[in-house]
Amino acid sequence: MMKYLKLLKIFLIFFLANKSFSFDYSVVRYSAWEKADVDLLYVLPAEVNTETKVLFIIHGASRDADRYLSMWLDAAKDKNVILVAPHFKKNDHPYFSTLGMASYSGKIIKDQDVWLNDSIAKFYAYFQNKYNLSSEQYLIYGFSGGSQFVHRYLMYGVDKAIEKAAIGSAGWYTFIESSPFPYGIKDMPLEPGRIEWLMSKEVLFLLGDKDNNPNHSTLNRTKGSMLQGSNRYDRGINYFDHLIRIGNEFNTPLRWRFSVMRGIDHNTKKMTQPAIKFLLKDLDYKD
């Protein structure tokens, strides 16, 4: 009986129909772990087959996963891709953008059971198994706080299944140097080979040149983040230059693409457009 109850707990997933936004999407409540549940908002393509890809869309501090998902619908409607937008609720996952590994003030969270460094791997396994998908890789996008999540997942995710990623306008970063985590990797070292792997990935790194407000309401102003620059644009420039230096140090060319959007500030919709083109490329149905 106890074994049955354990299995019931593992596979307890709730399907919901949601029409509260301006489009229809489905929701699966992922509860197959000991962490707090996460609602996965998703939209299926016209036809799902073994070649269908999965693209994860990670929200920012606003946590409005439905709005983030809506920005991809028109461009993806004829593509062979499942769009998935996890909703990390604030009460359940207050520090989602650090993968739950540290607070935004820099305090390490020692309870690894709440860490989100296995989250995308588990979410992908669900969709892969449910729809019999052949690909072992997925695509992922994050803007602002979502960009923080994605670049740290590239560093600390339990899987290495990211095929392509696009990240835009993070408020601050984890540098590959000896500063205390989450500003650096002190006390949170990367596994062997991880630097070379993340350097080799196809990543679009986006910044808006007008995202330079040092007094933006959601900008992290802790000492560690201020050492990275006074605003998002400067911090992004410094982080990308840092990656180039790390690549030279490890004799590993940085494959990431760098793109500055002229005249754009911290605008989710406008910054998402180049990511859409980048990640949806080559996802047409095959004859």
Model-derived features: positions:
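C-terminal catalytic histidine-bearing segment of alpha/beta-hydrolase fold enzymes
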Residues: 234-287
